[in-house]
A protein has these predicted regions:
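Ser/Thr-glycine-rich phosphate-binding loops at phosphate-binding pockets of nucleotides
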Residues: 100-106, 127-133
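Active-site beta-strand->loop->alpha-helix modules in alpha/beta enzyme cores, enriched
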Residues: 172-174
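Short beta-strand segments at enzyme active-site cores
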Residues: 128-132, 167-170, 226-227
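Charged catalytic cores and adjacent phosphate/nucleic-acid-binding surfaces used
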Residues: 39, 51-52, 63-65, 70, ...
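Short acidic (Asp/Glu) and glycine-rich catalytic loops that position anionic groups and cofactors
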Residues: 7-9, 130-135, 284-287
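Long, highly charged, low-complexity intrinsically disordered interaction regions
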Residues: 1-91
Length: 335
């Protein structure tokens, strides 16, 4: 194992364990620095053990590089690997074929598209939808129509490199206050997957929020209703209560319009809450279990969401990302 692989694997496990993103980035940046050196420079620093003389390499990352350079597994990587927990999910986890909600550094993710897709492929995914944010969410560097067009070109160029993993085009589009979607319809027409989520005015009154969400899930472009309550139950962003809405009306609209309800796997979200997950199941909704990953290691969060689906006795055939890619895309194209 070389230093670049070791550093990226450490970043992966730290992301998976929800360590401070700034500290994780130190390992990802160090991997980029070492990867950017030519062979002669690597040999020179390796023989002199002078890795820390490189700008951006600190004592912790230098130790990892030196240990990997010597041909041994770095102590930190061995420790992280040994401590990695089984995130659950059982048979349904094995049946999942992909992830329909994840972010790259084109919006507020921490890693390039290539690294996210390489990790997805290593996890055995058959497909992944890249769903960076839409323009109204400026705090997350949401993609304008022009930037989204450029991203689609980049994805086209990457498809052959990552085959047989299928990279699906997508977006996490904001549901605006009136229930419309925050992207040009012609751009939404070009995408494989549209996840629609509320990110603003989360505390509006129940009747208005219900109208807003029903209009969004009835939109023919919407495939998945993302993190429906918007709640946060833990984490460095603090606690945020659930939005108030008529869940029966919203989930009935999802069923009638063929929109999946997302089971968001992020530990700080656990959205929808258990009572609403049971309600959506009983109403007859289909579901999408997604990571909402903003870093490579978070792509393994699927186990959290799958365990919740198992606990709620959601039938596997009603989870859209257990379906083959062609079946999934036929479904997204049918509504």
């Amino acid at each position: 194992m070389g230093p670049v692989t070791a550093l990226r694997q450490i970043a992966y496990y730290k992301d998976r364990n929800r360590h401070d993103p700034r500290r994780v980035m130190a390992y990802r940046n160090a991997a980029d620095i070492i990867e950017g050196l030519d062979d002669a420079a690597r040999q020179r620093h390796g023989q002199a053990n002078s890795w820390q003389s490189l700008a951006g390499i600190g004592p912790k990352t230098a130790k990892v590089i030196a240990q990997a350079w010597s041909g041994r597994e770095p102590d930190l990587l061995a420790e992280l690997r040994a401590d990695a927990e089984d995130l659950g999910g059982g048979a349904i986890r094995a049946a999942l074929r992909g992830d329909l909600h994840l972010h790259s550094n084109w919006s507020d993710g921490s890693a390039p598209i290539e690294e996210m897709m390489a990790t997805a492929a290593a996890l055995g995914h058959q497909y992944c939808a890249l769903t960076d944010h839409s323009p109204r969410l400026t705090i997350a560097n949401g993609l304008s129509p022009d930037r989204l067009r450029k991203q689609l070109d980049v994805i086209d160029e990457l498809r052959e490199k990552f085959a047989p993993l299928r990279i699906l085009t997508g977006i996490e589009v904001d549901i605006l206050e009136d229930g419309s979607l925050d992207q040009e319809p012609e751009m939404l027409d070009r995408l494989d997957i549209v996840v629609a989520s509320v990110h603003s005015k989360l505390s509006m009154d129940s009747a208005a929020m219900t109208r807003r969400m029903v209009r969004a899930v009835a939109n023919g472009h919407t495939d998945v209703l993302g993190h429906c309550t918007g709640r946060l139950i833990a984490g460095n962003r603090g606690i945020r209560p659930e939005s108030k809405f008529d869940a029966e009306a919203v989930f009935t609209a999802c069923r009638e319009h063929g929109t999946a309800v997302e089971i968001n796997s992020r530990p700080e979200r656990r959205d929808p809450p258990t009572r609403l997950l049971h309600l959506a199941r009983d109403i007859g909704c289909v579901f999408s279990i997604d990571t909402d990953a903003h870093a490579p290691g978070q792509l393994d969060f699927l186990g959290y969401g799958v365990q919740r689906a198992l606990d709620a006795e959601v039938p596997a055939d009603r989870i859209v990302n257990t379906w083959p890619a062609d079946t999934l895309l036929a479904w997204t194209g049918s509504h």
